[in-house]
Regions:
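C-terminal helix-rich "cap/oligomerization" subdomain common to oxidoreductases
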Residues: 1-22, 88-90, 246, 321-358
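Contiguous beta-strand/loop segments that form the cofactor/metal-binding neighborhood of enzyme cores
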Residues: 2-17, 206-287, 318-325, 330
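Oxidoreductase and adenylate-handling cofactor-binding alpha/beta cores
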Residues: 148-172, 198-227, 239-249, 352
């Protein structure tokens, strides 16, 4: 995975299968975003068997098959959906098209694993909720900046164990490198990507809910701007939002497309979680000017100051839990309510945001 390319962020984990070979079969459909590689890597490491891939672009399919030699290129989407052995379809279509794909998947009795953002409008969210209710299938979401980042996984464990007491504030920053020349046309169209708070903001707002311990939140302010890309009038290169959760935890998120060329990775993503007995800072992808590696956890508690480098130490339990949820009809990886609550918060923030001109 190129460290400078956030669009193709796909961590390589360690195999930790939760099932026997052939017990869990999945397919990939919709290759518009490189997150599909991280989604597939996680499921394969957890014991999943990748059987099919489909996309209308044969070049994308050829690249995918080269990366996963055991997968078969499907002649059509319908060939994937008609295969009764396929239990889940992972999809990273253009954001505005993700719900339509998911509805087709669930209507064929299969579970759906969508890249973030899982939809771009509140109407699409209503359709997805209705689809889940009518089919009984899961609509899982790849909020990768928590699920596929070991420092974030470890922070969740620390909080659950009471390391910093009661959480009172969560702050997340998610800067990304633009790499404009590599972006497809839909990337610049707000109607297609959903707005910056819906798109990359979804990573941060989901973490506020998770670390803050509530799926209910009120937006107190939200802003977006297009400071440096006027040639794309509907694009947004900056956004921030303040929220208050139902349990009184406060949160702040900032996202942007201004990672400078001098940074050694695609974005200096950080999270700071304040508790009554201490605080945690995550330096997810780099420790600037100190360490080129990521997954640094800084913990300050009653006992002192602690630097915990956790890369390669924690793993990514979400994927195995998702497979077991499907095989055993449970809900341990992430509740459907949480997946949709995070999406709704992002969509509401995008809709309410004041656009700053300048």
């Amino acid at each position: 995975m190129p460290s400078n390319d956030g669009m193709n962020y796909a961590p390589d984990g360690r195999p930790a299968p939760v099932c026997s070979p052939g017990d869990f079969v999945f397919a990939a459909a919709g290759l518009d975003h490189g997150h599909i590689f991280g989604m597939c890597n996680g499921l394969i490491d957890a014991g999943g068997q990748l059987r099919w891939v489909y996309d209308p672009d044969p070049l994308k399919v050829a690249s995918f098959v080269h990366r996963y030699p055991g997968v078969e290129a499907a002649p059509s989407e319908d060939a994937v959906l008609q295969d009764a052995s396929v239990q889940l379809v992972a999809g990273a279509a253009v954001p505005a098209d993700r719900v339509a794909l998911g509805l087709r998947v669930m209507d064929h009795g299969k579970h759906y694993f969508a890249d973030k953002p899982p939809m771009t409008t509140l109407d699409q969210l209503a359709q997805a909720r209705a689809g889940v209710a009518s089919t009984g299938r899961k609509y899982a979401v790849y909020y990768s900046e928590r699920l596929h980042v070991e420092s974030a996984v470890y922070a969740g464990q620390l909080i659950a164990n009471g390391a910093i007491g009661r959480v009172v504030h969560v702050m997340g920053t998610g800067p990304h490198r633009l790499q404009a020349a590599s972006r497809p046309p839909w990337f610049w169209e707000r109607e297609r990507f959903g707005g910056i708070l819906c798109d990359i903001g979804s990573h941060q707002l989901e973490q506020v809910l998770f670390f803050g311990g509530s799926d209910e939140a009120t937006i107190t302010s939200a802003r977006v701007a297009n400071y440096a890309h006027k040639e794309h009038p509907t694009f947004e290169d900056f956004g921030d939002v303040n929220v208050v959760l139902a349990n009184a935890v406060a949160g702040y998120c900032r996202v942007d497309w201004f990672t400078p060329d001098g940074l050694g990775t695609w974005g200096d993503g950080r999270t700071v979680i304040l508790g009554t007995d201490g605080y945690i800072e995550l330096r997810k992808y780099i420790d600037v000017a100190r360490e080129p590696t990521g997954d640094h956890v800084y913990l300050v508690d009653k006992g002192g100051e602690h630097h915990l480098p956790v890369s390669g130490q924690v793993g990514y339990p979400f994927f195995g839990a998702l497979i077991l949820d499907i095989l055993e009809d449970t809900e341990r990886a992430m509740t459907q309510a949480h997946a949709f609550a995070a999406a709704e918060l992002c969509l509401t923030a995008a809709a309410q945001a004041v656009r700053v001109e300048g």
